[in-house]
UniProtKB/Swiss-Prot annotation:
Protein's organism: Salmonella typhimurium (strain LT2 / SGSC1412 / ATCC 700720)
Cell compartment(s), UniProt: Cytoplasm, Cytosol; Periplasm
Keyword Cytoplasm tagged: yes
Protein name, per record: Secretion monitor
Keywords: Cytoplasm, Periplasm, Signal
Gene (name only): secM
Signal peptide range: 1-37
GO cellular component, one term: cytosol
Family: Belongs to the SecM family.
SS bonds (residue pairs): none
Pfam family, one: SecM
Length: 165
């Protein structure tokens, strides 16, 4: 019975916890941290009557602000990154090789991965610059519904001039 428990503990220590922490680190890179300031900047939901009206002047800025994370690293995120660095540094320790052999590309990749993770802990994240000057596309409103225009918009098919005027 104790052998089963020992094997289970070894399995958890070797495989489960390192992969769980690596998953936490990988998942946290893609998810923005929400704060009260970010929630107040999001536009309010429009009603059904104003759903057809879209303001294109600030659309790109709103889309970029919703996508951009706050670049904050909390304690548990730092803890997970440090643990992953520790596990990777032990797993990627160089083997005893003769001195004459050149380092392999895989070793260079491992070193680059460790340098990137350690730089995330030591360097301060800077948000990307917001582009203030936008070129807006001209959208001509259609006055009447036509099947060829609908097909060309929905499926990208265009067989002639869009307007005959």
């Amino acid at each position: 019975m104790s052998g089963i428990l020992t094997r289970w503990r070894q399995l958890g220590r070797r495989y489960f916890w390192p992969h769980l922490l690596l998953g936490m680190v990988a998942a946290s890179f893609g998810l923005p941290a929400l704060s009260n300031a970010a929630e107040t900047n999001t536009p309010a939901r429009t009603t059904a009557s104003t759903a057809s009206k879209v303001n294109f002047s600030h659309f790109a800025l709103l889309e970029a602000s919703n996508r951009r994370p706050n670049f904050t690293v909390d304690y548990w995120h730092q803890h997970a990154i440090r643990t992953v660095i520790r596990h990777l540094s032990f797993a990627m320790a160089p083997q005893t090789l003769p001195v004459a052999d050149a380092p392999s590309p895989l070793q260079a990749h491992h070193i680059a991965l460790l340098n990137t993770l350690s730089a995330m802990l030591t360097q301060e994240g800077t948000p990307p610059a917001i582009v203030r000057r936008l070129s807006l596309a001209y959208f001509a409103p259609q006055t009447a519904f036509s099947i060829p225009a609908w097909i060309s918009q929905a499926q990208g098919i265009r067989a002639g001039p869009q307007r005959l005027s």
